[in-house]
Design a protein with these regions (language model features):
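ATP-dependent small-molecule kinase phosphotransfer cores
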Residues: 35-86, 126
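Small-molecule kinase domains that catalyze NTP-dependent phosphoryl transfer to phosphate-bearing small molecules
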Residues: 129-171, 198-202, 207-208, 216
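Short, non-transmembrane amphipathic alpha-helical segments
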Residues: 206, 235-259
Length: 266
């Protein structure tokens, strides 16, 4: 069955409608409840793991190196959950890093503007103009975060299969429409798309292992082969390649490792 990934301009709105979709489809629901186990598994602070999903690196916040490691750990855990199929996923930014998987339905849910404004008003107070400014700032912040973290603008409608505005349709009807997409032929799992997700899973698991020593590493997988791109100097390439092959070779499912020297990293 297809996998449904929900992105929203409000975490609360996204969570609410995602739970309804999971109930309607009888799918498993995956959200930020997995962050605590992630923090425990990788010896991280849960607060930092949450920050990685919400904040760009800064002098007084997370460093870029730590943020990237945190996001890699989140990716690894999330993709592992998606392999289970029959999943509604929300709150983990999967719409930005699970790409090229045709049985994955990406949906952007825009909150009821009046409800969102009321929520911000109760939290921050102020005039209608102030609330409008806060809303624009929030959208800009999420755009900056997604571009910095994954090179994609999560506010861009073209990154989704469906965009629903809850100012125009109620949640129950939206739930029905989203759940109805699971029967579309184009979203049914095929061997190629299933293998794409398996490749993503293997690459994520290998990357997490390698990042402790090689923070800027990039990994892609094809079957049991992984290709590793890392910044290395020519004179140390052979030695570093040996270290990488030993580390990556210990990852379950990896049978062959290629190491490429890379000079261009985003």
């Amino acid at each position: 069955m297809p996998i449904i990934i929900i992105s929203s301009d409000s975490y609360e709105t996204g969570r609410e409608i995602s739970k309804k979709i999971a109930k309607a489809t009888e799918y498993n629901y995956v959200d930020r409840e997995i962050l605590a186990p992630i923090a425990e598994k990788f010896n991280l602070q849960k607060g930092q793991v949450i920050k990685a999903l919400e904040e760009t690196p800064s002098l007084f916040g997370l460093s870029a190196k730590l943020r990237n490691r945190l996001l890699a750990c989140i990716e690894e855990a999330t993709v592992g959950k998606l392999l289970g199929d029959n999943v509604v996923c929300h709150g983990l930014a999967a719409h930005l890093y699970v790409l090229g998987v045709s049985h994955l339905i990406k949906v952007r849910v825009l909150s009821d503007s009046k409800k969102l404004a009321s929520q911000l008003s109760s939290e921050a107070g102020g005039s209608a103009d102030k609330i409008e400014t806060l809303l624009k700032r929030k959208v800009k912040k999420r755009k900056q975060w997604s571009l910095d973290a994954f090179g994609l603008d999560e506010t861009d409608p073209s990154n989704y299969d469906m965009v629903i505005n809850l100012s125009q349709i109620d949640q129950d009807e939206a739930t029905k429409n989203i759940a109805g997409m699971t029967v579309y032929r184009k979203f049914q799992p095929i061997t190629y798309s299933i293998n794409c997700l398996k490749n993503k899973d293997l690459a994520c698991r290998a990357r997490v292992v390698l990042m402790e020593q090689f923070p800027d590493v990039k990994v892609r997988a094809d079957g049991s082969t992984i290709v590793v791109e890392v910044k290395i100097k020519k004179r140390t390439k052979q030695k570093i390649a040996g270290v990488i092959k030993k580390l990556a070779g210990g990852v379950n499912g990896v049978e062959y490792v290629e190491v490429h020297a890379a000079s261009d990293f985003r």
